[in-house]
Amino acid sequence: MKKVSIMGVQYKVFFNSNDSRLEYADADGITDSTTKEIHIAQFENCPNSISNLHDYKQKVLYHELIHAFLYESGLDSNSDWARNEEIVDWFALQHKKIDSVFGEID
């Protein structure tokens, strides 16, 4: 378990979680804004899985962190776009490129 600060709010991140909500939601990760917890599923190598599970786990983590940021910013409760999985995925996948441009400007 790791702790991270999301806009000043402490979240606990659980890796290799066997939380039942993951299975119920058919999800590889979940963010619970009520308990301030992020759960990332346990991934196992098998013939049907992707080869680089470490990178995939990072993508799931980034996705869940974006959910937490949107919730803590208040955007999650104001409109549906902040809960839209495609928007969350886009930010999770593009955050390094965005940060790089910000770094060029500073």
Question: Which functions belong to the PLM regions below?
Answer:
Residues 103-106:
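Long, well-structured alpha-helical subdomains associated
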Residues 95-100:
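Short, basic alpha-helical nucleic acid-contact segments in DNA-binding proteins
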Residues 77:
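A glycine-rich, hydrophobic loop/mini-helix early in the fold
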Residues 56-64:
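Short alpha-helical catalytic segment bearing the HExxH-like zincin motif
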Residues 2-55, 68-72, 80-94:
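Active-site scaffold of zinc-dependent metalloenzymes
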